[in-house]
């Protein structure tokens, strides 16, 4: 079972959907930054852009690492990262290609469909 997290930039809300691994199999080979149709996730009319994700073992995807598997790379801490400037650290990251070992995919809505993502809450009668 995999999870997709869909961010709505207009409202600032995120929506979480659980999907089967066979749907992830249909997305195999796509990269971070690719746009996909929302019909994969029962959201007709929507267009979604892949912004990141993580593998089954928790390693995050990195946009500028063009492989499908994991790799240990040396990163430098600079602005926006904790630590002193100039400190380098070897970390394990996953490449930007979606594979069958993905457990979470992060997406953002680029085109909206006819139906809203949030289901309207039913009015309960007073008791």
UniProtKB/Swiss-Prot annotation:
Give this protein's Gene Ontology molecular function annotations.
structural constituent of ribosome
User: What gene makes this protein?
Assistant: rps6e
The UniProt family comment states:
Belongs to the eukaryotic ribosomal protein eS6 family.
Pfam families, per database record? Ribosomal_S6e
| UniProt GO BP | translation
What UniProt keywords are attached to this protein's entry? Answer: Ribonucleoprotein, Ribosomal protein
Query: GO CC terms for this protein?
Result: ribonucleoprotein complex; ribosome
Instruction: Specify the protein name.
Output: Small ribosomal subunit protein eS6
According to the record, the signal peptide region is none
Family annotation (InterPro entries): Ribosomal_eS6, Ribosomal_eS6_arc
């Amino acid at each position: 079972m995999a999870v997709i997290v869909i961010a709505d930039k207009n409202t600032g809300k995120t929506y979480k959907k659980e999907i089967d691994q066979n749907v992830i199999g249909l997305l195999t080979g796509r990269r971070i930054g690719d746009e996909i149709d929302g019909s994969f996730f029962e959201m007709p009319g929507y267009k979604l852009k892949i912004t990141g994700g993580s593998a089954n073992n928790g390693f995050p995807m990195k946009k500028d690492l063009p492989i499908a598997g994991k790799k240990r790379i040396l990163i430098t801490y600079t602005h926006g990262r904790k630590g002193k400037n100039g400190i380098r650290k070897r970390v394990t990251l996953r490449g930007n290609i979606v594979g069958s070992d993905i457990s979470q995919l992060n997406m953002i809505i680029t085109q909206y469909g006819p139906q809203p993502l949030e289901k309207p809450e039913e009015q309960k009668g007073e008791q």
